[in-house]
Each structure stands twice: as C-alpha cells, then as structure tokens.
Amino acid sequence: MNELTKATAITSRLVSPQDLPQRGQDAWRQFLAPRPIAFLSYAYTKAVASCVPLVRVCRLELSGRPVAYFPFQYRSRFHAAAGIGQCLGGEASDYFGLIAEDGFRIAAEDLLRLSGLKSLFFTQLTEDQQDRGLGGARREAGHFIDFPEGGPAFWESKRRSDKHFAADTERRERALVRAHGPLSFAYLDPDPAGSLDRLIAEKRAQYRRTGVRDVLASARMRATLHALCRTQDAQCSGVISTIHAGDTWVASHFGLRAGPALHYWFPVYNPELKNFAPGRILLKQIIFNAQSQGLTRIDRGAGDSPSKRDFSTSQHFFCGGLWQRPGIAAAAHRIGLAIDWRIRSLR
C-alpha cells in the first residue's frame, strides 16, 4: 500500500507508556528486534516516562493490528495543549524515530495528525527512517566502532592503520601507570548508583569549565539517568563503567546497551589527568573487555569530532528538523525555535 492509502486506513490511539498492554509491548520489541537501538526501545520509553511527565506513545493500528509505535514528549502542559511535541528524552537522547513493522511507511504530516500534534522539533533521526517515509533538513554524521573479532584484534588493526595514534595511546597509558599505579577497570561498576552520582557531578563540572550547555541541570534528567541505570532489558540496559589507576579515579562512562551494541553516551574523565588522555584510555579498556561481555559494536551517536574519528570504523548519518502541520501553533513554534537558536548563538 502507498502512503496515502495507509494514512487513511490507519487508526491511532495515544497512551502513556505504562498503559501499553503486554501485547503492544511485545509487538514493539518485535519491530525493534532486527536492529535494536536502546533509545527506541519500550524499556527506554518507560524509564523516561517514570521521571518526565507528559510522555506519550502513539500506537498506530491497521485493521486492529499494531503496525507502529511513535514515542514523544511535551515540554509542558502549555505545549501539550498547543500540540507542540519534542523527541523523547529531549536534547540528551541519541536517537529518535518511528518503531514499525517492515514495509510500513507514513508521511510526517500524517504521523503528526494521528499523534494529535501540530509540530514537533527533533534531532537524531537516522537516515534509514527514510524507509519509513520520514526525513529532516539538517544532516549530521555519526560513528560506529565495530570489533567483531574482539578488542585485541581491533587494536592490532588500529596499530596497522594508525601507528602513531596507537603508540601514543599506549605511551600515555604506561605513563599513567607509572605515575599513579596499575589500572583497574570495571565494565559494570559494583556501586552503580554511587558511581553514577559521581559521574553526573563530574560531567556537570566539565560543562561549566567548557561553557557547554548543561543537559544534566534538570533534576528530571538526573532522575532519568538513575532510572535507566536500574533498567535491565535485552533492548535497553544501563551500563556504568569506571577505570582507576591505583587509588586514583581516572574516568567513567554511563551508556545504554542494546543487544551486542553499547551506546557511548556520557563519558567523563579526571581533569587533573588530562595529559594522559584518560578518555581515550577508558574507551580502549571498554573495547578490550567487550568480547567477554558479548559486545561487538560501540555507537558513538551523532557528532564528527576528531576523538570520534580516531576510533571509528564506519560512519552513518542523522538528520534533524521541524515537522509541521499548517496552523498558528506550528508557526509560533517555528518562530520560538528561531529565537532560541539566535539566543544560543550569542552566548
């Protein structure tokens, strides 16, 4: 069926994630199973909804059969009343999109209508969502690190392809050990809640030092990270990893695991050890221990920085933009976003 036929035949229902019946949860998992992405999972949606009000899921059905799920959120009751939505998890989320059965396609305007939305601003929509009929205007690169043969084999390949980078990393690692003691790495920190509190504090201090917008300033966002840290689901599991040199904390990372992939989300390192490249050493340790954890990929999310390219084995693309239906609310949303972007550019 083409987009128009599907749009006219589809029925929709807007529900809170916790109200989605087991049959719906199972269908969601089945749709996501061919390529599990933690940020598109039902478990992620439920965890966010436990801390953030006004999270909704649009359940799309065809002849009474679920064919797609579209999670999103409202920033406030005012935005909900005006039909102005945003991607689930806001600006901190690494992925956004429609979870649907194979072959399902829908135009963005129809998806908004069925979801009761006038407009929706989004980032991190993967380009493969074009197969669903969805797209955006702005394009941004992202990077994968794939190591199907395990971490040591990956590092040997890195030695051959970028000898200077590999040798420099190993030199800094040896210098760190000489200065502070042997390295100890925990893929799953034994005190996840306490370690996450420290990571959040250190990450917020990093944002202040660098002048970057603090996405952890919101108490709801911090609570969401803790909820995700407690989440243990095949398509979304919280993972907090730490590395020490002797008794000195070197670096930590909190991310989400989906099947054999780890979403590299919130890394932070000890600023007093910056000359040792602690972030690089942490990532190397995670890769070296990945095979024992059943991991074969690290997803670095959107962004094309040198630090991401250093480890990258392949590139993919995201897009962002503003979906709209005609109306006053959508026009006001567009103007508001333009003002917000202008204010941020002046900071």
Language-model features, listed with the residues they occupy:
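A conserved beta-strand-loop-helix scaffold within acyl/acetyltransferase catalytic domains
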Residues: T11-S63, V67-G85, L125-Q130, L134-G142, ...
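Residue-level marker of positions within ordered structural domains that often coincide
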Residues: M1, A33, G103, P148, ...
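Short C-terminal domain-edge/linker segments immediately following a structured domain
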Residues: G89-G90, A100-G103, G151-F154, E173-R178, ...
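Active-site/acyl-donor-binding loops of N-acyltransferases
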Residues: N2-T11, Q129-S161, G259, S292-R347
